[in-house]
From Swiss-Prot:
Taxonomic lineage of the native organism: Eukaryota, Viridiplantae, Streptophyta, Embryophyta, Tracheophyta
Catalytic activity entry: a 5-hydroxy anthocyanidin + UDP-alpha-D-glucose = an anthocyanin 5-O-beta-D-glucoside + UDP + H(+)
Protein name stated in the entry: UDP-glycosyltransferase 75C1
Positions that bind UDP-alpha-D-glucose: 336, 351, 354-356, 359, 375-376
Role played: Catalyzes the glycosylation of anthocyanins from UDP-glucose.
Keyword Glycosyltransferase: yes
Organism: Arabidopsis thaliana
Primary enzyme class: transferase
PANTHER family with a match to the protein in the record: GLUCOSYL/GLUCURONOSYL TRANSFERASES, UDP-GLYCOSYLTRANSFERASE 75C1
SUPFAM superfamilies: UDP-Glycosyltransferase/glycogen phosphorylase
Documented EC number(s): 2.4.1.-
Gene: UGT75C1
Amino acid sequence: MATSVNGSHRRPHYLLVTFPAQGHINPALQLANRLIHHGATVTYSTAVSAHRRMGEPPSTKGLSFAWFTDGFDDGLKSFEDQKIYMSELKRCGSNALRDIIKANLDATTETEPITGVIYSVLVPWVSTVAREFHLPTTLLWIEPATVLDIYYYYFNTSYKHLFDVEPIKLPKLPLITTGDLPSFLQPSKALPSALVTLREHIEALETESNPKILVNTFSALEHDALTSVEKLKMIPIGPLVSSSEGKTDLFKSSDEDYTKWLDSKLERSVIYISLGTHADDLPEKHMEALTHGVLATNRPFLWIVREKNPEEKKKNRFLELIRGSDRGLVVGWCSQTAVLAHCAVGCFVTHCGWNSTLESLESGVPVVAFPQFADQCTTAKLVEDTWRIGVKVKVGEEGDVDGEEIRRCLEKVMSGGEEAEEMRENAEKWKAMAVDAAAEGGPSDLNLKGFVDEDE
C-alpha cells in the first residue's frame, strides 16, 4: 500500500521508462493514460532523442515527463552508431534514472514519491536501477505473450533442447518452425546485441520472487500463451491502441488528403500498405516484389512511404512506379487507426509489428503478413494459422519473393471467395473481443485496475 511519510494514503506513482522508439512510446502513453484513469500518477521517461522527434506531449493531469540523454540526442547517424548505442543507452540512462528517482524521493514538497517502476522491452537495466532504491518493478511487454514465452524457454537451459527438433513444441504454444521464431533466434538472422539484451530481460525476471508483466494483449487472443510459463505472472491489459482520431499519436503529420481519397472509393476496395517505421530498410527485392504485386491486382491502394532522404528516394525506380500509378495514393504518414476504420479499406499489407497487428484486429481488417524481423515472424504465424485473419507471404530461404506471390496473397484476401470470407468473419470476431477487452469494465480494463489497486 502506498502511504505518505505521516501514514496517510497515497495513490500509486509509477515511473514508466521505455526505449526511445515510436513503437514503444505509443503503447506506453496509452498505458499511462489508463493508469491515471484508475487513480495513479505517472512520470513518463525516455530519451531526449525521442522527445525531439515527437510532437508536443499531451497535457494530462497526473502525467509528467522526465527526459534523459542516451548519448545520441540528435538520433543515430549510421549503422556503426547502432553497434554501441545499446551500451550507451544503458550507461547514460541508468545514471539519469538514478538522478530522477533520487530527486523524487528526496523532495520535501508535496511531490508524490515514486512507488513503482514500469519498464518496456529493450531496457532491462531499468530493473537494476529500481532495485537499488528498493522499488518494485513491472515489465511492460509490447509484443505478443507468445514471443515472451519463446524467449523464456530459449534462454532457460531446462528447455533449450526443445529448439533442436522441428516442429518446435513448447508448453501450451502452437507448433512452430525455426522460420516462425523471432528473427533474433534464427541462425541466419541472429543479432548478438539483441540476444544479449533479451537474455538480460529473462535474467531480470528470474531475480524476482513474483515477477509481474503487463502484456499488451488480451486474454481471449492469447489465453494459453499467457499461462504457458508458470513462474511468470502475465497480466493482459491490451490492446493498448490509440483512438481513430489519433490524438495521442505524437508522431503523426497533418497530411489528411488521404481521407478524402478514401471517401471516393468503394467499400472494401482499397489495399492499405504500411510496413512500419523501418520501411526505408526494406530489402530492394522485397520492394520490387511488393510494387509489381500490388500493381498487378489493378486495385486501388494507399501506400505509406516515409522518406528520410527525399532526394535519394527520388532515384528509387519502384517508388516512381507506384507514384506513377493512377490507381494509388502515396503519402508520408497517416493516422493508421483512422485508415483501418475506414469502410473503403479491404486489406492491410503489414510487416506484422505488434502495434499494427493489434490495430488491425481492433478494426476487423484482414491482412497480408509480410514480416521482416524481430517478433514479426512469430506474429505472422499467429495471424495466418492461429487467428486465421490473413495470409503470410511465402519467402525463400535467401529472402527471395516475387510479385506473383504478393499478387496471390492480395487476391486471396480481397477476392471475396470462401477463404476471404472466412478471414473477414474471423477478423470481425476478433474485433468484437478486442473492443470488449479494452472497454471500461472489460477484462483488460479490470486487470489493470486490479494491478493499481494492489499497489494502493
